[in-house]
Amino acid sequence: MEWNGLKMIISTMEPQVSNGPTSNTSNGPSSNNRNCPSPMQTGAATDDSKTNLIVNYLPQNMTQEEFRSLFGSIGEIESCKLVRDKITGQSLGYGFVNYIDPKDAEKAINTLNGLRLQTKTIKVSYARPSSASIRDANLYVSGLPKTMTQKELEQLFSQYGRIITSRILVDQVTGVSRGVGFIRFDKRIEAEEAIKGLNGQKPSGATEPITVKFANNPSQKSSQALLSQLYQSPNRRYPGPLHHQAQRFRLDNLLNMAYGVKRLMSGPVPPSACPPRFSPITIDGMTSLVGMNIPGHTGTGWCIFVYNLSPDSDESVLWQLFGPFGAVNNVKVIRDFNTNKCKGFGFVTMTNYDEAAMAIASLNGYRLGDRVLQVSFKTNKAHKS
């Protein structure tokens, strides 16, 4: 798929670091990589920027096609771009969308801002042109207590100005903090004040003074190379399980806000709504499922059949229904060839079995508008499209 360039000139903006699974929180373009352009900063829309959006905290494995599909479901897009590291090709966790109609841009913010995708909660907002006052406002912080949370990190730095994004790096296997974080302020002068106030200080719980400096310091090139190797490692993995209760709370809020969805059943979900639990990768840690005839299992993940969609349903409905539960590879609404209306069903492919099963257990029986959804793993029975 060819992608149109954005009207926004991003080549003149300051470089950032890629956002990968080494973070314990969703990343924005708040880090320090010299191989990519910096995003435009978020802020109030002007007359010239009411169609231009910046999207932060995207999942590391989200593709450009999925990015376009998600935002294209809202309205006609003039251009969009998922920003990648120029050397490694890895997604940096943010992108830009430029709509033709300002109303669609506003709708995208109202509908998709705060949407949970995999382990991240995306942030959708208007973009504003970069300027000297907001360039180079990224800070690198080391020596943090291993017990410090992202919220505590923000509380520590928030006294110096408005924080755009923050993150703490964690060990990919254990999920334990590496004691290193990043803070992006709204303005460079705020970052300068934070350096003056906190560099060499000992925050609560710290045994050693912390180091606070600008993230784009050339001396960090070796760290950038190490991060790039980590991102490209085939053995990397996301730490820890997803917190499904938090996701479920987010789903209820999102569906009620966007579609007026109400849970049809007040009691527990019937056992038939959720297939027996087993590992999608191995059985007893030894036997691969490749080649086994298991409902819903495909070469790219777990395919879910969604039935009783309304004729006006599109891909955005499926994205918003299933995104809160985990990694969604792709979605597809089956349409009538003549009318281009939804034929009443669609498919969602999710990477992880547990996440797919949780989505089925939660969404089977949901009332979407005046229809009750039937959600299950796809069987081998062919569905005519």
Swiss-Prot record:
Asymmetric dimethylarginine: residues carrying this PTM:
R248
PTM comment, free text: Methylated by CARM1, which leads to reduced RNA-binding activity and enhanced interaction with SMN. Methylation at Arg-248 by CARM1 weakens protective binding to the 3'UTR of CDKN1A mRNA and down-regulates CDKN1A protein expression, thereby maintaining cells in a proliferative state. Methylation is inhibited by NGF, which facilitates neurite outgrowth.
- Source domain of life is Eukaryota
Outcome of mutating P280A: No impact on interaction with EIF4A
List the biased-composition ranges (Low complexity). Answer: 18-33
Q: Where is this region: Disordered?
A: 12-48
Task: Cite the RRM domain residue spans from the record.
Answer: 51-129, 137-217, 302-380
Q: What is the effect of changing R277A?
A: No impact on interaction with EIF4A
Q: Which UniProt keywords apply?
A: Cell projection, Cytoplasm, Methylation, mRNA processing, mRNA splicing, Phosphoprotein, Repeat, RNA-binding
**Modified residue Phosphoserine is at which positions?**
S38, S233
Indicate the secretion signal residues: none
Chain intervals with Polar residues compositional bias: 34-44
Q: Which residues carry this modification: Omega-N-methylarginine?
A: R248
**GO cellular component labels:** axon; cytoplasm; dendrite; growth cone; perikaryon; ribonucleoprotein complex
Query: What is the reported phenotype of gene knockout?
Result: Transiently impaired neurite extensions of several cranial nerves, including glossopharyngeal nerve, hypoglossal nerve, trigeminal nerve and acousticofacial nerves in the midembryonic nervous system at 10.5 dpc, however no developmental delays of the nervous system in later-stage embryos at 14 dpc are obvious. By postnatal weeks 4 to 8, 70-80% of the mice exhibit an abnormal clasping reflex of the hind limbs upon being suspended by the tail. Decreased motor coordination, as impaired performance on an accelerating rotarod is observed.
Q: Which Pfam families match?
A: RRM_1
**Which molecular function GO terms apply here?**
mRNA 3'-UTR AU-rich region binding; mRNA 3'-UTR binding; mRNA binding; poly(A) binding; pre-mRNA intronic pyrimidine-rich binding
Q: Does the keyword Metal-binding apply?
A: no
Task: Explain the induction of this protein.
Answer: Up-regulated by glucose and by insulin. Up-regulated after memory training in radial arm maze experiments. Up-regulated after sciatic nerve injury. Up-regulated during adult neuronal stem cell differentiation.
Q: Name one GO biological process term.
A: 3'-UTR-mediated mRNA stabilization
Function, in words: RNA-binding protein that is involved in the post-transcriptional regulation of mRNAs. Plays a role in the regulation of mRNA stability, alternative splicing and translation. Binds to AU-rich element (ARE) sequences in the 3' untranslated region (3'UTR) of target mRNAs, including GAP43, VEGF, FOS, CDKN1A and ACHE mRNA. Many of the target mRNAs are coding for RNA-binding proteins, transcription factors and proteins involved in RNA processing and/or neuronal development and function.
Family membership, please give it: Belongs to the RRM elav family.
Q: What is known of its domains?
A: The RRM 3 domain is required for binding to poly(A) RNA, for the association with polysomes and with the EIF4F cap-binding complex and for the stimulation of translation. The RRM 1 and RRM 2 domains may contribute to polysome association and stimulation of translation.
- The protein's name is ELAV-like protein 4
Q: What is the species of this protein? A: Mus musculus (Mouse)
Q: Which gene encodes it?
A: Elavl4
